[in-house]
Amino acid sequence: TTPQGIRKQKEELVDILDKLKAANFNTVLFQTRTRGDVLYPSSIEPFNSILTGKVGGNPGYDPLAFAIGECHKRGMECHAWMVTIPLGNKKHVASLGKQSVTKRVKDICVPYKNEYFLNPGHPATKEYLMRLVREVVERYDIDGVHFDYLRYPENAPLFPDKYDFRRYSKGRTLDQWRRDNISEIVRYIYKGVKAMKPWVKVSTCPVGKYRDTSRYSSRGWNAFYTVYQDPQGWLGEGIQ
């Protein structure tokens, strides 16, 4: 990345933040992890290619630190927005090469419908995600962390987790086990963040429809049954 390129990237972000401030926004979700790659210097995953045109390419500055500083200058909170379970399609994963989590921590990754995903049913998945979260929360003056795609993929009935289900389900149905897997990741990360910095907010982006009601059908697209999220349960437990 050239000095001119760095300056342009920073100017574009500053322009966005100025517009948000003028519109009275008080919180910015800055994308920090995409699909197995990141937008800050990490010891765990490579830089996203959007910054330099090359996977793992150092942009010459720390985009997350810059974003946090500029948000705070404007009196706005900055939350690290992290995509969690999906790792991208086969082409994207191949572009990461040996730096991909699918190569480094194979046991927690599964291919499904031409894409790769972290496996919520593997106990080490929450540990891996917590390593990424810890890296961000410990190193940066972040105000919150926000989790996207913390769920099973669409059309998940055939998701390849039979081995883990047999090993870890302990008598639960497949639906309940999967739902518990997602809730355990939420719980584990929430408690981990609060143990490090109690003031850092933890939020998740669930599917907008919780489940069907007697009057309204979700037409097969809801949090509880389709992708195994239980946001009402999270709120009731106080882990959101």
Residue ranges and their predicted role:
Residues 23-59:
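Aromatic-lined carbohydrate-binding/catalytic grooves of carbohydrate-active enzymes
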Residues 1-7, 45-61, 112-130, 170-182, ...:
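The substrate-binding groove and active-site-proximal loops of carbohydrate-active enzymes
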Residues 25-33, 60-110, 146-149, 186-203:
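Glycine-rich, aromatic-flanked loop segments that form ligand/cofactor-binding clefts
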